[in-house]
Swiss-Prot record:
InterPro entries: aa-tRNA-synth_II, aa-tRNA-synth_II/BPL/LPL, Fdx_antiC-bd, Fdx_antiC-bd_sf, Phe-tRNA-synth_IIc_mito, Phenylalanyl-tRNA_Synthase. It comes from Drosophila melanogaster (Fruit fly). It is found in: Mitochondrion matrix. The gene is PheRS-m. PROSITE patterns: AA_TRNA_LIGASE_II (PS50862), FDX_ACB (PS51447). One of its GO terms (molecular function) is ATP binding. Its EC number is 6.1.1.20. This is Probable phenylalanine--tRNA ligase, mitochondrial. GO terms for biological process: phenylalanyl-tRNA aminoacylation; tRNA processing.
Length: 453
């Protein structure tokens, strides 16, 4: 979520403008144990299991709750803003906050409940960390929406870590943090000053079977409104949502920040927008939001309300507000890093001062893929990135696929990855890097049946 962060376009919410594809589950890896224990529960593994011990080690770290941590500071700023923006008649905050929810969710919670198509690329093993075919580490905190709405909540924030298989560089990490919010209102509340107006069109039947309600999950969906809602209801809800989110943005970035709204598509909201700010001569995406799809509310047992939702990445905000250059720093326990931040004054956001600049070490790794296997057709670079993380941990700063080659005679494909090593807290020797590099090469042979060039 970032000047370079811009390429991350939707770390806060699942994007749906990527190509649709399907992926069959391969046989279970021989390295997977028969069972995994995560967050106090035991799960049987199967052919979908791809979560690694390295990734599981992050579960329960709760960096967003760690005192004097930059992510905790951003979390508190967001929570405090919503506490102030919405209060009941007694002056108490309307929004409740859930920041320790179990990150293990079902496929239904993460995808089906949010109307994400069955063939959407975000469901693939190459994108998510699956515990088994029915359970995964949540890819977004939006996964808890139906659960909380079904429990009777109508104004809430969910904050926590989310997990995505991704590339390796200074702005991508397999675990990051999101804040998600939902606000629902009834007709009486929305039209308090205009009691003659309605939430829903007279022609709408109010059932899930209504073909006017069930729309294909397409980025060409009507950006004006959903068929069930009246235009008046949508416009009032849109106005409130945008007013509140612009207020949040100004609270974080200052009252004179330049901003703009951009139409977009999310499977779970319609219409949908992204909020961008003009920062250091670039437009920077800050958050995604929209009017909640009414199908989601109906599945939650709510039939007479309209709502908005938004999602934002905490790292995205913190990297900009604190001038933190590398996303790995959020996982550092170095006192030289952590001592720079304090929760005593949440509105005094210090700029990060580098502890030291350690040199990079760069090594290339080239290998032949097995016969009839190609990149993104049997071999996913994300699988290689996970392997590297498991072997080298945070000593790897960046990986890039720098070359692909198909032999004209044998038909075999070759790839070359450039791996940049740099520790955040000390200097790495070339000999140390070479040893780690050998371990990565050996693990690649064992895991992918490749031939090192």
């Amino acid at each position: 979520m970032l000047l370079t962060l811009r390429v991350q376009g939707a770390r806060h919410w699942l994007k749906s403008t990527r190509c649709l594809a399907s992926s069959a589950a391969p046989a279970k890896s021989p390295s997977s144990p028969p069972q995994l224990e995560v967050s106090g529960s035991t799960y049987a593994t199967d052919g979908w299991t791809n979560v690694t011990p390295k990734i599981l080690s992050y579960v329960g770290a709760n960096k967003h709750l760690q005192t004097d941590h930059p992510l905790s500071i951003i979390r508190q700023r967001i929570v405090n803003y919503f506490y102030g923006a919405y209060r009941n008649q007694r002056g108490n905050p309307l929004f409740s906050v859930y920041d320790q929810m179990n990150p293990v969710v079902t496929v239904q919670q993460n995808f089906d409940n949010l109307l994400i198509p069955a063939d959407h690329v975000s469901r693939q093993k190459s994108d998510c960390y699956y515990i088994n075919q029915q359970h995964l580490l949540r890819a977004h905190t939006t996964a808890h929406q139906v659960e909380l709405i079904s429990g009777g909540l109508d104004n809430f924030l969910v904050v926590g870590e989310v997990y995505r298989r991704d590339e390796i560089d200074s702005t991508h990490y397999p675990v990051f943090h999101q804040a998600d919010a939902v606000r629902l209102v009834t007709k009486d509340k929305l039209f308090e000053r205009n009691p003659g107006l309605e939430l829903f069109e007279e022609t709408w039947s109010g059932t899930l079977a209504d073909p006017k309600l069930i729309l294909p999950s397409s980025k060409f969906m009507d950006q004006t409104k959903q068929p069930c809602h009246t235009l008046e209801a949508v416009k009032l809800m849109e106005h409130e949502m945008k007013h509140v989110l612009v207020g949040l943005t100004k609270d974080l970035f200052g009252p004179r920040i330049k901003y703009r709204w951009v139409d977009t598509y999310f499977p779970f909201t319609q219409p949908s927008w992204e909020l961008e700010i003009y920062f250091k001569d670039n437009w920077l995406e800050v958050l995604g939001c929209g009017i909640m799809r009414h199908e989601i509310l109906q599945r939650s047992g709510v039939h007479q309300s309209i709502g908005y939702a938004f999602g934002v990445g905490l790292e995205r905000l913190a990297m900009v507000l604190f001038d933190i250059p590398d996303i790995r720093l959020f996982w550092s326990n170095d006192s030289g890093f952590l001592s720079q931040f304090s929760e005593k004054d949440l509105h005094n956001l210090p700029k990060y001062k580098p502890i030291s600049h350690y040199p990079q070490c760069t090594n290339d790794l080239s290998f032949w893929l097995p016969q009839d296997i190609e990149v993104d057709a049997g071999f996913s670079p994300n699988d290689f990135y996970d392997l590297v993380r498991s072997v080298a941990g945070d000593m790897v700063e960046q990986i890039s696929l720098v070359d692909k080659f198909k032999h004209p005679k044998t038909g075999k494909s070759s790839v070359c990855f450039r791996i940049v090593y740099r520790h955040m807290e000390r200097t790495l020797t070339q000999a140390e890097v070479n040893e780690i590099h050998k371990q990565i090469a050996s693990a690649s042979v064992d895991s992918f049946n490749v031939q090192i060039r």
